[in-house]
Curated annotation (Swiss-Prot):
Keywords: Kinase, Nucleotide-binding, Serine/threonine-protein kinase, Transferase. This is Putative pyruvate, phosphate dikinase regulatory protein. NCBIfam families: PRK05339.1. The keyword Transferase applies. It is an enzyme of class 2 (transferase). One of its GO terms (molecular function) is protein serine/threonine kinase activity. It catalyses: N(tele)-phospho-L-histidyl/L-threonyl-[pyruvate, phosphate dikinase] + ADP = N(tele)-phospho-L-histidyl/O-phospho-L-threonyl-[pyruvate, phosphate dikinase] + AMP + H(+); N(tele)-phospho-L-histidyl/O-phospho-L-threonyl-[pyruvate, phosphate dikinase] + phosphate + H(+) = N(tele)-phospho-L-histidyl/L-threonyl-[pyruvate, phosphate dikinase] + diphosphate. It comes from Lactobacillus delbrueckii subsp. bulgaricus (strain ATCC 11842 / DSM 20081 / BCRC 10696 / JCM 1002 / NBRC 13953 / NCIMB 11778 / NCTC 12712 / WDCM 00102 / Lb 14). Its EC number is 2.7.11.32, 2.7.4.27.
Length: 285
């Protein structure tokens, strides 16, 4: 009898209540996610799952998101949306599915409204119009960080441009520079004999940029990088045969995709960015 009680107590300790926290945002959702995390640490005995849905900017994307999360039990929806048209479906969904929901922005907007005796609807509209360029850049920068280095294949489908390239072809700094121009950029490092995400083949080839370089230039850059880390510069990473194989593999993929290719050897990232923007016929606001 004593053993059974002990086992029951042990089972109670190991079984955790599952909570699915859904983060929905019209931007990267970092604020909503950070708030959810800060709250969730107060419940160490709960099994908390975070499911993030960033850049939900229209009703179609929101509908798909709500349809997807319907499968999860014990929902807590944390959302950050400026557009009321996108807030209402979330509230309706939450009520119909008996889910808890938290609006990150409205309490702050309401507090400012009460303090200033101003109507938030007019203020938000005017502010958005005046600072649209700024917010687009911030959103693009957050996007570039979130989808850097192939972290999440879903980003490829949402991006304005996707950069492909072997290691040390300036993918990340180029992504950030283009993001500062207002473009949503995702990038993927290419390594021979590794799986290419299916999403890459679903993208319009005109949105894909294949980065390449000269073998000797890449060899020099990689050797210098190893030396800066206090490591042996003569490794497979900087070996000319390996470099040639990597570049050949990348070029074969670019040919298969039919994408635009840029040789970044001896080019500044500003020059490369200009070539990409010209290719996309993109003009900065």
């Amino acid at each position: 009898m004593t053993e059974n009680k002990a086992e029951n107590k042990q089972t109670e300790k190991t079984e955790k209540m599952e909570v699915n926290i859904i983060i929905i945002s019209d931007s990267a959702g970092e604020t909503a996610f950070n708030n959810a995390q800060a709250a969730a640490v107060q419940f160490p005995d709960a099994e908390v799952n975070y499911r993030r849905y960033p850049f939900i900017v229209n009703e179609k994307k929101l509908a798909a998101t709500l349809e997807e999360i319907e499968q999860y039990p014990n929902l807590v929806i944390v959302y950050s949306m400026l557009d009321e048209k996108l807030q209402l479906p979330i509230i309706k969904f939450a009520r119909e599915h008996k889910a808890r929901y938290i609006d990150i922005l409205s309490p702050i907007i309401e507090a400012i409204s009460q303090t200033t005796h101003m109507k938030p609807t007019g203020l938000v509209g005017a502010n958005h119009q005046l600072t649209n360029k700024y917010f687009n850049r911030i959103s693009a920068m957050e996007f570039a960080v979130m989808y850097d280095d192939g972290k999440d294949p879903r980003g490829f489908l949402e991006a304005d441009v996707v950069l492909l390239g072997v290691s040390r072809t300036s993918k990340t700094p180029l992504s950030l520079l283009l993001a500062n121009k207002g473009l949503k950029v995702a990038n993927l490092p290419l390594v021979p004999q590794t799986h290419i995400p299916n999403e890459i083949y679903q993208i319009d080839p005109t949105k894909i940029i294949g980065l390449t370089t000269d073998p000797q230039v890449l060899n020099r850059i990689r050797r210098q990088r190893m030396i800066s880390y206090g490591m042996d510069p003569d490794t497979a990473y900087s070996n000319m045969d390996s470099i040639n194989a990597e570049l050949d593999s990348a070029m074969a993929l670019y040919k298969k995709l039919g994408c635009f290719v840029i040789n970044v050897a001896e080019r500044s990232i500003e020059e490369t960015a200009a070539l990409i923007m010209n290719h996309l016929s993109y003009e900065e606001d």
